[in-house]
């Protein structure tokens, strides 16, 4: 196995390139520990949307590579209460008066480990929220998040470990705004979902679930030309088991991108702007948009709590398969 890890500079910023004969990734720790590039080396296809300049990344950091959302998506008015404490997150979606996508996608993470093993190549990064004063004003907890990226054969494994090193419990959710290149004229998309959340004009769930009107096509592989998406789906895994995954089929390149998530990821947001930008974001979330303000069971919303001293790991993976035709 031709495993490799090297330090590089990416658009003027320190980065780590790692991979094998199948896959190559670039991780930029200072840019929210973003896997900014993922290349299938068999076909030389760039899988993720990359910025052309550092400025373009900083303008819209959640629309390149694999941004880490902690917590993911919107919190109405940036406000919620948990165990007697009221939290006020910054309003960074001013037109809808929401907090959007959490604290970590633009912060500098620390590199913990880079290593090669017989199993694959591993890059670990970590961020301690207690060291970020502007985060502590909003989320006054000693939370630590560690990302472990492993490339083994034709798969990138992403493991997110959330740790409570403080003295008080906190609610948490994590997700990824994974931004894949998606030429709509030659690509299809499938998702293991039968239901989606009804959203209001602020893109917040009303609490009502609806059947996906095109679910058969969604299961089999949809043509997304002329389809605009910013929708929140409940994974069908929650009710009937099976796989919990999104798949992109690049028909021209004869490859499939299989994006799997473990049982903690109960929801998927699918976003493609106006459908004409050449990208698609299948976003696995452990909690649904605005989960902290929904009067619904946590078993449905995905709202989880870490008590002092506890930690948990949420696992996902991206596998590239060749479609021989």
Swiss-Prot record:
InterPro entries: Aldose_1/G6P_1-epimerase (IPR008183), Gal_mutarotase_sf_dom (IPR011013), GH-type_carb-bd (IPR014718). Pfam families: Aldose_epim. The keyword Isomerase applies. Keywords: Carbohydrate metabolism, Isomerase. One of its GO terms (molecular function) is aldose 1-epimerase activity. The keyword Isomerase applies. GO terms for cellular component: cytoplasm. Pathway: Carbohydrate metabolism; hexose metabolism. It comes from the Bacteria. The active site is at 177 (proton donor), 283 (proton acceptor). Its EC number is 5.1.3.3. Induction: By nitrogen or tryptophan starvation. Substrate binds at residues 73-74, 230. It catalyses: alpha-D-glucose = beta-D-glucose. GO terms for biological process: galactose catabolic process via UDP-galactose, Leloir pathway; glucose metabolic process. Belongs to the aldose epimerase family. This is Aldose 1-epimerase. The gene is galM.
């Amino acid at each position: 196995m031709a495993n490799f890890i090297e330090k590089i500079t990416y658009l003027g910023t320190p980065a780590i390139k790692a991979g094998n004969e199948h896959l190559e990734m670039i991780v930029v720790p200072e840019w929210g520990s973003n896997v900014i590039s993922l290349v299938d080396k068999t076909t030389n296809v760039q899988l993720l949307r990359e910025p052309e300049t550092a400025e373009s990344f900083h303008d819209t950091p959640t629309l390149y590579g694999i941004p880490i959302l902690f917590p993911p998506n919107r919190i109405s008015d940036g406000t919620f209460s948990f165990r007697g404490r009221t939290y006020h997150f910054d309003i960074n979606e001013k037109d809808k008066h929401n907090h959007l996508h959490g604290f970590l996608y633009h912060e500098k993470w620390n590199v913990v480990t880079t290593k090669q093993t017989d199993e694959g190549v591993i890059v670990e990064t970590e961020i301690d929220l207690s060291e970020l004063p502007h985060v502590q004003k909003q989320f006054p907890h000693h939370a630590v998040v560690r990302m472990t990226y492993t490339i083994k054969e034709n798969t990138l494994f992403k493991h997110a470990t959330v740790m409570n090193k403080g003295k008080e419990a906190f609610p948490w959710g994590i997700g990824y705004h994974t931004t894949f290149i998606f030429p709509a004229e030659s690509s299809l998309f499938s998702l293991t979902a039968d239901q989606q959340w009804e959203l209001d004009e602020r893109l917040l769930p009303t609490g009502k679930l609806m059947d996906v009107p095109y679910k058969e096509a969604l299961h089999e592989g949809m043509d997304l030309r002329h389809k605009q998406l910013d929708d929140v789906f409940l994974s069908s895994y929650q009710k009937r088991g099976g796989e919990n995954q999104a798949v992109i089929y690049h028909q021209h390149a004869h490859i499939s991108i299989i994006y799997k998530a473990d049982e903690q990821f109960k929801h998927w947001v699918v976003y493609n702007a106006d459908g004409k930008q050449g990208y698609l974001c299948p976003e696995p979330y452990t909690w649904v948009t605005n989960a902290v303000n929904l009067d619904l069971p946590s078993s449905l919303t995905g709202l989880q709590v870490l008590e002092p001293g506890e930690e948990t790991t949420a696992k996902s993976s991206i596998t590239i398969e060749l479609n021989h035709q």
